[in-house]
Amino acid sequence: MSDIATLSATVPSSSTQITPFGAHLLSWRPTDEEDVLWLSSRAVLDGTKAIRGGVPLCLPWFGGPEDSPSRPGPGAGAHGFARTSTWKLLASTQPANDAPASF
């Protein structure tokens, strides 16, 4: 799917794919069904820019830098720094039919 690292989890009801780049949910697919999430054909999946599509982590603001109460100034990206940061997986467990992960 990409040139960036991904983490996958599968439970009886579905499968998911997450990348530590932006802690971004790339895919959620119920078993025997199509992917529920949209990922742009123009998405760059090499870690050089924010991913277009899926479910991004928007932090500390949503929108352009002008929407941030702190007014971060020129060079600040849309939706904050979180979606272009590489996150580290701290824990992963799989009790019963759940698949939680902590970033």
Identify what each model region corresponds to.
Residues 1-103:
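Surface-exposed acidic/polar loop and edge beta-strand patches at domain peripheries
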